[in-house]
Amino acid sequence: MRINPTTSDPGVSALEKKNLGRIAQIIGPVLDVTFPPRKMPNIYNALVVKGRDTAGQQINVTCEVQQLLGNNRVRAVAMSATDGLMRGMEVIDTGAPLSVPVGGATLGRIFNVLGEPVDNLGPVDTRTTSPIHRSAPAFIQLDTKLSIFETGIKVVDLLAPYRRGGKIGLFGGAGVGKTVLIMELINNIAKAHGGVSVFGGVGERTREGNDLYMEMKESGVINEQNIAESKVALVYGQMNEPPGARMRVGLTALTMAEYFRDVNEQDVLLFIDNIFRFVQAGSEVSALLGRMPSAVGYQPTLSTEMGSLQERITSTKEGSITSIQAVYVPADDLTDPAPATTFAHLDATTVLSRGLAAKGIYPAVDPLDSTSTMLQPRIVGEEHYETAQRVKQTLQRYKELQDIIAILGLDELSEEDRLTVARARKIERFLSQPFFVAEVFTGSPGKYVGLSETIRGFKLILSGELDGLPEQAFYLVGNIDEATAKATNLEMESKLKQ
């Protein structure tokens, strides 16, 4: 198999007809193309079909070479609908892999898998482009330092801290706040780290992609007046697109993120929603290419495909890519090959709970289900580790006592257990926090809470110094000083009412 060299030819857009082939067969989104002898395109080369269909409509379809079949034939997967294509049509070999625009020109814009803008805001500066297929950074380039990526979100920083240059899985159903959490992270990294974000919508609903774009404009993450001031680039390959586009859109987003890391030497946040759809698209393509299915009907190359994407998401000596990936779990079965393969690559898992969302505690991160490999005393320090463990123990004890409380009531508990329950309820409320991106809806200003402030707050609650304060004072505040101030206000209000 000949793999294409990873250099990109910037002149490909001019499309010189140096190497022409013809369509021999069309099977849905898969094309077989015949080329002259000794002029076979390399694997991953982009092929372009231009022409008119029987109705006279203009056709412009880009495909990617996947297999060399022998007899001067290649099999390619289309990145857009193949309606109107016919046998015998001319196919141009571009001589290079798909290349997409990278750099500052991509910020504030929406792209498709081919790097074409789809937001009706005019053309994008394409002087700097990059091929979507690259090898992962070499060992010698990797940065092996373990450091915490502070998000300013209390529950995340304390109980399941993110690793700089790590990969985080975001597990949650519909309507529990995945999108709002993603937007807050984009906002916080822009403010605190001066970094940029890339959002890859892989096989998601078009409506959700549109909602995200509108919300980003409202919250100022995308600056409509001065687009260059925006902090995020969006790449979408929606559910209605062919499997080829859904399989490659993650790589397009990753390529844009890699440029910010390697050339601009920035810390980048890469969001992928949803990583399961990437696997699903790969499975469809695999079947279309005639490969034998593997376990549960997935592609036999599942681990390789996942690895080639995930291994490129890493920290180098130049900068870091920290990736947050939404993971759909089919039929809630974590042993399904798709989520199981994803788990192997994750450094932390953030689990969103419908129960907490129903209580009105946002972000609805489940403090007991969420995990992180970074929560070790040698990495985060003894104080952080001890505080996190004591918070978890208190919440776990509260969870165990809930059945007894439901049947017998609080009065039947021992003095010690009643104290634990009171503190756990304060902790639960203190884990909530007002978000900057939700200011429009809640009316309360967002809060960024530093890690040292977070630890100080929870230590005070656990020590019992704040046992006299009402639990309502801890709900939707930033640091612990705001909670004590809120308690004083609540006390004054109740006195005035009396």
From Swiss-Prot:
InterPro entries: AAA+_ATPase (IPR003593), ATP-synt_VA_C (IPR055190), ATP_synth_F1_bsu (IPR005722), ATPase_a/bsu_AS (IPR020003), ATPase_alpha/beta_chains (IPR050053), ATPase_F1/V1/A1_a/bsu_N (IPR004100), ATPase_F1/V1/A1_a/bsu_N_sf (IPR036121), ATPase_F1/V1/A1_a/bsu_nucl-bd (IPR000194). It is a peripheral membrane protein. Keywords: ATP synthesis, ATP-binding, CF(1), Chloroplast, Hydrogen ion transport, Ion transport, Membrane, Nucleotide-binding, Plastid, Thylakoid, Translocase, Transport. It catalyses: ATP + H2O + 4 H(+)(in) = ADP + phosphate + 5 H(+)(out). Its EC number is 7.1.2.2. ATP binds at residues 172-179. It is found in: Plastid, Chloroplast thylakoid membrane. CDD domains: ATP-synt_F1_beta_C (cd18110), ATP-synt_F1_beta_N (cd18115), F1-ATPase_beta_CD (cd01133). Signal peptide: none annotated. F-type ATPases have 2 components, CF(1) - the catalytic core - and CF(0) - the membrane proton channel. CF(1) has five subunits: alpha(3), beta(3), gamma(1), delta(1), epsilon(1). CF(0) has four main subunits: a(1), b(1), b'(1) and c(9-12). Produces ATP from ADP in the presence of a proton gradient across the membrane. The catalytic sites are hosted primarily by the beta subunits. This is ATP synthase subunit beta, chloroplastic. It comes from Castanea sativa. The gene is atpB.
